[in-house]
């Protein structure tokens, strides 16, 4: 009977250790996914900012070109 108790405790202990390791791995994966999401968000934000800056520069250049055509002597 004592042998069965020891075996049962050993099985339960190993199961808990295995479960603990799985939970830890799951948490690590979630952290990695969050970091990837943060990096992607930051990349999108910087890309939007760059596009916005380029569009503003293109708009100013176009406005200056139109002003140069409409008012050739002024600048």
From Swiss-Prot:
Protein's cellular compartments: Secreted; Target cell membrane
Listed InterPro entries: Dermaseptin_dom, Frog_antimicrobial_propeptide, FSAP
Annotated propeptide span(s): 23-45, 74-75
Proline amide found at: 72
GO cellular component: extracellular region; membrane; other organism cell membrane
Keywords: Amidation, Cleavage on pair of basic residues, Membrane, Secreted, Signal, Target cell membrane, Target membrane
Statement: the UniProt record of this protein carries the keyword Membrane: yes
Signal peptide boundaries: 1-22
Main location: secreted
Pfam families: DD_K, FSAP_sig_propep
Protein's UniProt keywords contain Transmembrane: no
Biased composition regions of type Acidic residues, renumbered to the chain: 30-40
Span list, region Disordered: 26-46
Tissue: Expressed by the skin glands.
Task of the protein: Antimicrobial peptide with weak activity against Gram-positive and Gram-negative bacteria and fungi. Has been tested against E.coli (MIC=96.06-256 uM), S.aureus (MIC>192.12 uM), K.pneumoniae (MIC>189.00 uM) and C.albicans (MIC=384.24-1024 uM). Probably acts by disturbing membrane functions with its alpha-helical amphipathic structure. May penetrate bacterial membranes, but stay at the mammalian membrane surface. Does not show hemolytic activity. Does not interact at all with cardiolipin.
Record-stated family: Belongs to the frog skin active peptide (FSAP) family. Dermaseptin subfamily.
Protein name: Dermaseptin-SP5
Organism: Agalychnis spurrelli (Gliding leaf frog)
């Amino acid at each position: 009977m004592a042998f069965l108790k020891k075996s049962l405790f050993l099985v339960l202990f190993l199961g808990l250790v295995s479960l603990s390791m799985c939970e830890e791995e799951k948490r690590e994966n979630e952290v990695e996914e969050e970091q990837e999401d943060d990096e992607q968000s930051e990349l999108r934000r910087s890309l939007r900012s760059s596009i916005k800056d380029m569009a503003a520069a293109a708009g100013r250049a176009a406005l200056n070109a139109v002003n140069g055509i409409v008012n050739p002597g002024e600048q």
